């Protein structure tokens, strides 16, 4: 069998997922002390559930994680636990954030999840380079080719 397989009592498994989720209102809050604190909280909660983090990146307005989730946990139940418990822990550590987010919910409702097969290396590289790609996309969006109000082509200065 392959070395990246895991096993439980009577099960051998290799369940890897690429997960992306964002703070409520997609606020750009994940930087500096918040970034380090949120990273510690997410690692702690994953360890408690036996979820292995292969790669992770905290961008200012979203989180990318490549994780192995045991088959005894469903993705939806694990993510409900991760987002719910981490919200409470984030608000305990950073009480000032309670005023920006109502109802003690730090994360938005949805998430993106994709299974990972033979393309694991490519996804790990994508996650590692995510911050650079966000900066490039922001720079590209500074100049719009067409005026959003008139629809006419803008002239570069």
Protein language model regions, located:
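Basic nucleic-acid-binding interfaces
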Residues: 1-157
């Amino acid at each position: 069998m392959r070395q990246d397989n895991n096993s439980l009592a009577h099960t051998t498994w290799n369940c890897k997922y690429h997960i992306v989720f964002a703070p409520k209102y997609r606020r750009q809050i994940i930087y500096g002390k918040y970034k380090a604190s949120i990273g510690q909280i997410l690692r702690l909660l994953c360890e408690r559930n036996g979820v292995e983090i292969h790669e992770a990146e905290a961008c200012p307005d979203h989180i990318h994680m490549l994780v192995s989730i045991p088959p005894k946990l469903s993705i939806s139940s694990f993510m409900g636990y991760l987002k719910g418990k981490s919200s409470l822990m984030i608000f305990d550590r950073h009480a000032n954030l309670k005023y920006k987010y109502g109802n003690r919910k730090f994360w938005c409702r949805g998430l993106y999840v994709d299974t990972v097969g033979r393309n694991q290396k490519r996804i790990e590289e994508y996650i590692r380079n995510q911050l650079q790609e966000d900066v490039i996309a922001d720079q590209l969006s500074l100049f719009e080719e067409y005026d959003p109000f008139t629809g006419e082509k803008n002239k570069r200065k």
